């Protein structure tokens, strides 16, 4: 689970982010996976899963993300975009770093209960936290993801 607030001094750049997110391929828009002259993802005979390795090394996560059919489209409100989305096993920290390099301002949180980690990314810094008990989870993440209800639901299922 990821929550992201994006802003930029240039309204056109912020609209570019909205359009990329709503197209469903925001990482690919800003950090495209290398392709050959035919537009196909480059295949490496030494690494049959080159796309996977490239994505994790550059985006920070296995798959791209963007608007899903069950999400509302991203919009600009008060000079920023606020979205929530899912990624596979890790947050897109490499992608956030690239946006920061392009003068976007990023404020993000992430929570991965299956792997017992969470974190806060702000001003180009990632505060990654592995937790063994719920007391280690920062209050901001606890509140943002409604973790009281989440953990009560998990306990009911056990």
Segments predicted by a language model, with ranges:
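Intrinsic low-complexity, intrinsically disordered or marginally ordered coil/linker segments
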Residues: 1-158
């Amino acid at each position: 689970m990821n929550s992201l607030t994006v802003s930029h001094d240039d309204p056109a750049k912020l609209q570019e982010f909205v359009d990329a997110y709503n197209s469903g391929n925001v990482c690919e828009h800003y950090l495209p996976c290398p392709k050959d002259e035919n537009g196909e993802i480059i295949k490496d005979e030494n690494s049959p899963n080159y796309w996977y390795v490239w994505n994790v090394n550059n985006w920070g996560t296995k798959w791209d993300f963007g608007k899903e059919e069950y999400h509302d489209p991203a919009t600009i409100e008060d000079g920023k975009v606020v979205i929530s989305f899912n990624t596979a096993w890790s947050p897109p920290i490499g992608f956030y770093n690239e946006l920061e390099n392009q003068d976007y301002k990023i404020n993000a949180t992430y929570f991965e209960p299956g792997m017992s980690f969470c974190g806060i990314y702000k001003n180009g810094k990632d505060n990654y936290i592995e937790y063994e008990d719920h007391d280690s989870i920062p209050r901001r993440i606890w509140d943002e993801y409604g973790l009281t209800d989440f953990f009560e639901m998990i306990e009911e299922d056990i």
